[in-house]
Amino acid sequence: MMLRRKLSVVALAAGAVLAGCSSTPSDDVTASWSPNKLYAEAKDELNSGAYDKAVPLFEKLEGRAAGTMLAQQAQLEKAYAHYKANEQAQALATLDRFMKLHPASPAYDYALYLKGIVNFNDNLGMLSFLSKQDLSERDQKAAKESFESFRELVTRFPDSRYTPDARARMTYIVNSLAQYEVHVARFYYSRGAYVAAINRAQSAISDYQDVPALEEALAILMRSYDALGMAQLRDDTRRVLEKNYPNSAYLTGGPRSTQGPWWKLW
């Protein structure tokens, strides 16, 4: 998995016992450990899924290796441990601190990627946007923040190894946000709140381009106009639907023929 790869920022061979650590409490079993050993132990805990043990070890490493690349690595590893432990707020706070302290870090692209992943809140893997989990009913604020992190990544680091996956997730997020508007419009239509349905369908159409959800947005718009007796607007919308989706099931008054989430490709 991409997030578990060793980052190039690590320079394990450069580790040495740093000055200023002599005040470590005597009951600290890590007191005599070198930064490299401390990192190795923390990494072992992380890889074994013992995130509650990994986090404090990475925190110790941050202090002992302060000012070094290994300290930067410890911050990123700690953020990842928080993420894997489903501690989203702590992960985001750690990443924000890292990016504030190290704007020129060679691992900045990874920090942006991980921040996007944390907000994306996806534990199913790189291709989970093909699963049955429908993001249209999830927290849209987090989705937008995730999109912004990915957008900064692909803009600033177009050649990053994380950019291709970030682009794919950006497309998925845009589709999800559009579908959310349609989801709300559908709800209003089903309750007879046709003006509200029109407003949400129009938001989807105006804010998003070339996304699958627009077909249903047009259909809801057409039917809402019809329910309100607005024949001219209904017919105009129908012509747009016919032009863009000539084979749409909505044109015959039936539901869309596909089954499952709108974004599931196969």
Name each model-derived stretch:
Residues M2-S8, C21-W266:
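Acidic, polar-rich low-complexity tracts and alpha-helical solenoid repeat scaffolds
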